[in-house]
């Protein structure tokens, strides 16, 4: 990954780098790989995330359909 430093402005370049890393999901990946995760824990985490996504989608549908 490459960030250009313009006009010797390192702070702005660091902010751009952090934003890029955040968008790419590097921080999330680092957090997940910090410790070994058992396959059963991984399945449970992924299932919980799927349930959260489904609930969120259903809430959005209810809001959209209820507004009509």
From Swiss-Prot:
Keyword Ribonucleoprotein: yes
Basic and acidic residues: bias regions: 37-49
Alphabetized PROSITE patterns for the sequence: RIBOSOMAL_S21
Gene Ontology cellular component list: ribonucleoprotein complex; ribosome
Region spans: Disordered: 37-68
InterPro entries: Ribosomal_bS21, Ribosomal_bS21_CS, Ribosomal_bS21_sf
Biased composition (Basic residues): 50-59
Protein's UniProt keywords contain Hydrolase: no
Keywords annotated in UniProt: Ribonucleoprotein, Ribosomal protein
GO molecular function per UniProt: structural constituent of ribosome
Similarity section: Belongs to the bacterial ribosomal protein bS21 family.
NCBIfam families, per the entry: S21p
Name of the protein in its database record: Small ribosomal subunit protein bS21
The organism of origin for this protein: Novosphingobium aromaticivorans (strain ATCC 700278 / DSM 12444 / CCUG 56034 / CIP 105152 / NBRC 16084 / F199)
Gene coding for it: rpsU
């Amino acid at each position: 990954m490459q960030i250009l430093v313009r006009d010797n402005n390192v702070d702005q370049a660091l902010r751009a780098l952090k934003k890029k890393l955040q968008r790419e999901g590097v921080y999330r990946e680092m957090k997940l790989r910090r410790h070994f995760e058992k396959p059963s824990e991984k399945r449970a985490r992924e299932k919980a995330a799927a349930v959260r996504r489904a609930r969120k989608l259903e809430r959005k549908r209810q809001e959209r359909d209820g507004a009509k």
